[in-house]
Amino acid sequence: MSRITTDQLRHAVLDRGSFVSWDSEPLAVPVADSYARELAAARAATGADESVQTGEGRVFGRRVAVVACEFDFLGGSIGVAAAERITAAVERATAERLPLLASPSSGGTRMQEGTVAFLQMVKIAAAIQLHNQARLPYLVYLRHPTTGGVFASWGSLGHLTVAEPGALIGFLGPRVYELLYGDPFPSGVQTAENLRRHGIIDGVVALDRLRPMLDRALTVLIDAPEPLPAPQTPAPVPDVPTWDSVVASRRPDRPGVRQLLRHGATDRVLLSGTDQGEAATTLLALARFGGQPTVVLGQQRAVGGGGSTVGPAALREARRGMALAAELCLPLVLVIDAAGPALSAAAEQGGLAGQIAHCLAELVTLDTPTVSILLGQGSGGPALAMLPADRVLAALHGWLAPLPPEGASAIVFRDTAHAAELAAAQGIRSADLLKSGIVDTIVPEYPDAADEPIEFALRLSNAIAAEVHALRKIPAPERLATRLQRYRRIGLPRD
């Protein structure tokens, strides 16, 4: 397939005429005569002085630093001079507090420079990590082809990583693999689309769609929050029988997190996974609610309705969402809607209990505003793992329990016939959770979210926006101390 040049990338993404190069003459390093001739030929053929070009431009008026490979220059390979150029650009972006767009197209380490070139990936990765630790967005667009040490370093450290359709993306290039092992690498593995399916990257985006996607992402990542919408008048909470709420939460047509994003959010950018395999039961996104920027982490309802079961991969994705929110200093919105944990040998061997524990510990101590929402079923450890936020909202028919009511009945009565009775006794419905201080606000349903999905999504969006707006005003140490004290006192006698 044809390759996207750095010129084509800049023209497609940046505001017209906004690019300013940061590059000076490449660092002079001692080279053999044969390599010097290769460099001279590459410069003559491409008009570029190295395999990497850096600078800054604007995306819809926002300053953005840019680092991009030119594959036609020695396969976009990275030697000492190219690595020094990349590192200097990343350090400058950090110093000037700019978001960074990196677009590799490279075979990896420049073999003509050997081990010294190989070690350059360390300083590039270090510079990018420091940029990330400065809470600055790092966005990656992988172009065809990206392999080797480039993919295994600065190509895989993005907060958001997307790739060109059809691009060859992988660690070891297929030609090298075949020469080393005598067999061709399995087809269809090292493709952008396959990596997207497996959660290694966040999306596959054509070049002509990259600019609007970056605009949406930057709107969430760096633009200021908008003024808060007019406050809603609190509605009285009807006395709904517990089992009616359980039944309502299981309706096949009940809106889930995707409907909330579609109807209640703007500037949505869906993220894919954890770099360890996609978890279809968990959704991760950037979005704004009522003009308030957030990271959204939601448990997805199963296709055809009902709750999904949550396994260790979904919880790893939840942890990625928590880390992303903290690293970018964005409020985190968590949507709970799960029938319970996945119960299988694979889940046990995948560390389900440990992932629940890590989610729980990381969320309750997270250094950013957090809002949890009991949207429907809140059953078991996966629900608990996403609950301990600064503020907890519940849909009228949302509920929270250590097990599905049928499971609790099986333990206590050795049958499932007492599920409704036990659900009421355990205080799992939203009204009971409000009384016990577990929930702060109940979002009404008239009479059921499934009967008014768009109106409900807008109502919930407004409630989220109000909570996020209020939490952002509280100093981080005070917010964290209040959160810890809140969960320290759950279940204790009130003064």
Curated annotation (Swiss-Prot):
Quick check: keyword Cell inner membrane in the entry? no
Induction / repression: Does not show significant changes in expression throughout M.tuberculosis growth phases.
**Keyword Transferase assigned:** yes
Any one GO BP annotation for this protein:
mycolic acid biosynthetic process
Q: Which InterPro entries match?
A: AcCoA_carboxyl_beta (IPR034733), Acetyl_CoA_COase_Trfase_b_su (IPR000438), ClpP/crotonase-like_dom_sf (IPR029045), COA_CT_C (IPR011763), COA_CT_N (IPR011762)
Question: Per its UniProt record, what SUPFAM superfamilies does this chain match?
Answer: ClpP/crotonase (SSF52096)
Alphabetically sorted, this entry's keywords are: Transferase
Domain named CoA carboxyltransferase N-terminal is located at 1-236
- MF terms (GO), sorted A to Z: acetyl-CoA carboxylase activity; transferase activity
- Where the record annotates domain CoA carboxyltransferase C-terminal, the positions are 242-470
Quote the disruption phenotype from the UniProt entry.
Answer: Not essential for growth.
One GO cellular component from the entry?
acetyl-CoA carboxylase complex
Entry's EC annotation: 2.1.3.-
Pfam families recorded: Carboxyl_trans
Tell me the subunit arrangement: The biotin-dependent acyl-CoA carboxylase complex is composed of an AccA protein, which contains the biotin carboxylase (BC) and biotin carboxyl carrier protein (BCCP) domains, and an AccD protein, which contains the carboxyl transferase (CT) domain.
As for what it does, the entry says:
Component of a biotin-dependent acyl-CoA carboxylase complex. This subunit transfers the CO2 from carboxybiotin to the CoA ester substrate.
What the record says about family reads: Belongs to the AccD/PCCB family.
Further facts: Was identified as a high-confidence drug target.
Q: What is this protein called?
A: Probable biotin-dependent acyl-coenzyme A carboxylase beta3 subunit
Provide the species name: Mycobacterium tuberculosis (strain ATCC 25618 / H37Rv)
Q: Which lineage do the record's taxonomy fields give for this organism? A: Bacteria, Bacillati, Actinomycetota, Actinomycetes, Mycobacteriales
